Amino acid sequence: MILFVRDLTVIDAAYLCPHRGVVGESWLVDIELTGELNEMSMLFDFAKVKKQLKSIIDAEVDHRLLLPQKAPETLIEQAAPGYVFVDFLSEDHTIHLHCPEQAFAVIPASEITPETVTAYLLTLISNQLPGNIDGLKITLRHEHIPTPSYH
């Protein structure tokens, strides 16, 4: 059985790029769950899917600065309790931040891409799904805008 949710939410976030500095991004999120029907003959209650998965995504990456933890340009240090120092040192940009921990999502990757954010979300969400769910697919995509836009 497959349950597909198109446009579950929109991730509005920023990330650090060694060439462009701080870059804003918006991704539409689609989710596909596969598995066996439960005792109520449902894969997963549709209302719960939307609420639970959207809340995880919103809490973890929406309206945050996404940090590429494994990038050679990134240095993350604990500051005072609840605060973090971030230094991002590239040939083109030097960025120094001192912010509350909740301002960031630390992505275990060398760069921020839809694929690395998807892998991060798969890890977070997979642990929160009921036992009858055996497959999870997440797609991050840009909204098609037929008029000129800047990215």
What are these regions (language model features)?
Residues M1-H151:
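Charge-rich, low-complexity N-terminal segments
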